[in-house]
């Protein structure tokens, strides 16, 4: 069982702040987690291969293709209004001021 003092020390190391009533709950939960880890450590896994994927299927790989990723012209073709021409020239979206 993790004591209240140990829980406070762990919280301090993790830079967490708890109210006094929450430290007790944290201590209990942390003790439960440590008990679960102890149970898992008792399991004999020496004859079990490490799991690298939850699925037995192999991922299909594809060849890399170099393509143009400059989509600014396509995006800016849809700009309308007074700022459309300027937006296309400077390649920026012109928006109304948001922050005063």
UniProtKB/Swiss-Prot annotation:
This protein's name: Aspartyl/glutamyl-tRNA(Asn/Gln) amidotransferase subunit C
UniProt GO MF annotations: asparaginyl-tRNA synthase (glutamine-hydrolyzing) activity; ATP binding; glutaminyl-tRNA synthase (glutamine-hydrolyzing) activity
GO biological process, one term: regulation of translational fidelity
Coiled coil: none
Top-rank lineage group of the source organism: Bacteria
Catalytic reaction(s) noted: L-glutamyl-tRNA(Gln) + L-glutamine + ATP + H2O = L-glutaminyl-tRNA(Gln) + L-glutamate + ADP + phosphate + H(+); L-aspartyl-tRNA(Asn) + L-glutamine + ATP + H2O = L-asparaginyl-tRNA(Asn) + L-glutamate + ADP + phosphate + 2 H(+)
Job of this protein: Allows the formation of correctly charged Asn-tRNA(Asn) or Gln-tRNA(Gln) through the transamidation of misacylated Asp-tRNA(Asn) or Glu-tRNA(Gln) in organisms which lack either or both of asparaginyl-tRNA or glutaminyl-tRNA synthetases. The reaction takes place in the presence of glutamine and ATP through an activated phospho-Asp-tRNA(Asn) or phospho-Glu-tRNA(Gln).
Quaternary structure annotation from Swiss-Prot or TrEMBL: Heterotrimer of A, B and C subunits.
InterPro entries: Asp/Glu-ADT_sf_sub_c (IPR036113), GatC (IPR003837)
The protein's Enzyme Commission number: 6.3.5.-
NCBIfam families: gatC (TIGR00135)
Pfam families recorded: GatC
Species for this entry: Rickettsia canadensis (strain McKiel)
């Amino acid at each position: 069982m993790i004591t209240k003092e140990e829980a406070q020390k762990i919280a301090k190391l993790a830079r967490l702040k708890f109210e006094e009533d929450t430290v007790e709950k944290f201590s209990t939960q942390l003790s439960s987690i440590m008990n679960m880890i102890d149970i898992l450590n008792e399991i004999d896994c020496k004859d079990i291969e490490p799991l690298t994927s939850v699925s037995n299927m192999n991922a299909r790989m594809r060849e890399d293709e170099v393509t143009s990723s400059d989509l600014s012209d396509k995006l800016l073709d849809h700009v309308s209004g007074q700022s459309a021409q300027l937006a296309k020239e400077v390649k920026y979206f012109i928006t109304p001021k948001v922050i005063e």
